[in-house]
């Protein structure tokens, strides 16, 4: 039992001595490798001036932070892994307590100064200079994290069902292809630690090495970020409200022309669509190369609503026509009163208009002129009694037949009627007044019939424009939105 504490103390001392020797070995190795007399971090690690230093690149995407469509900038969080060999940093591990890996501050060793060429904020290099990992064979691995803002040309043609190809172009700032060679370690970027974006889907991340045959000193490595937008946000907040507002324009053709609100509804819908168009202009980049899909749809619907305003003016003009201002042509009657209503599933209710107006029997005695004559001169046939279409008020009861038949039997009908003592001048004036009233009522009924015909023509025109509006709206909406949904966008590449 007494030997146990001594054993523990001995083991602890051995471990501590081992750590001290290892720390001393790493410190000695660091001093030996980075001795200013044998290592200069400004000199390219080449044994001769013609030797190419091969830089192996591999990009790891951590997060697609944002894509600013209006400023055409893509912000990404990436790790750019760089590997190369520096023969001056090789050592024999057996001479340094078996140390095979050494971590050295990045600014104390030679770096290939690879930067993002197409940056958009002036920050070309990485923000954090992490340590480089150096192995005993001289291979160096550097994995600096960086948040890059790169320029990205936004294609707005299919917005919000668009697919973009944004690139990250890496190149050495001071070394050309005669001094270093940039190669891809893997054909695509790594997404092992990728955090999914709520707005974009990653379609592909291919990498490519670009050289210029006409310029032997040029070489770069480019990664294509092929991303596809998730359209749910814009569908809910833009497309569906626009479709619903456009559908309100259909109600314009259902409103009666007498209500006086057709033009108000049309202009209100047009103003709402104009507001959405201004909202779109704040999102997409101000480019004249193409029109975004949602902008095309808004312009299309604005044209339709403007068309509905024009048709509403035409319908109201037809609706308020009268015989005193317009004469209905025969082709208008044939086309809009007989033929078109059948094709538009319209049926005009039958109207039974009578020009005979009969007061209550208890107030007036009604008789025709023939009836008055018959009352004074003798009986007549029932056909003559009801043959006339004109009625008048007779305030005096008919006299008995025997009272007038003796001295008027030999006279003509009109002479007998006028020679009758009961045919007074006021009765003649009453007959003329009643005749005028009857003619006026008949003229009013005839004018009213023409006015009703114009109103029905306006209803037919309204229904015709309704079907035209519905068909054009449906076909236009499908023609605009269906092709981008099923179209496969080919990724564009730089020349």
From Swiss-Prot:
The record marks 81 as: Key residue that facilitates effective access of the conotoxin BuIA to the channel binding site. It catalyses: Ca(2+)(in) = Ca(2+)(out); K(+)(in) = K(+)(out); Na(+)(in) = Na(+)(out). GO terms for cellular component: acetylcholine-gated channel complex; cholinergic synapse; neuron projection; plasma membrane; postsynaptic specialization membrane; protein-containing complex; synapse. It holds the Pfam family Neur_chan_LBD. The record marks 133, 141 as: Key residue for a low dissociation (K(off)) from the conotoxin BuIA. Glycans are attached at residues 35, 92, 137, 165. Activated by a myriad of ligands such as acetylcholine, cytisine, nicotine, choline and epibatidine. nAChR activity is inhibited by the antagonist alpha-conotoxins BuIA and MII, small disulfide-constrained peptides from cone snails. The heteropentamer CHRNA3:CHRNB4 activity is blocked by the alpha-conotoxin ImI and AuIB. Gene3D superfamilies: Neurotransmitter-gated ion-channel ligand-binding domain (2.70.170.10), Neurotransmitter-gated ion-channel transmembrane domain (1.20.58.390). One of its GO terms (biological process) is neuronal action potential. Component of neuronal acetylcholine receptors (nAChRs) that function as pentameric, ligand-gated cation channels with high calcium permeability among other activities. nAChRs are excitatory neurotrasnmitter receptors formed by a collection of nAChR subunits known to mediate synaptic transmission in the nervous system and the neuromuscular junction. Each nAchR subunit confers differential attributes to channel properties, including activation, deactivation and desensitization kinetics, pH sensitivity, cation permeability, and binding to allosteric modulators. This is Neuronal acetylcholine receptor subunit beta-4. It comes from Rattus norvegicus (Rat).
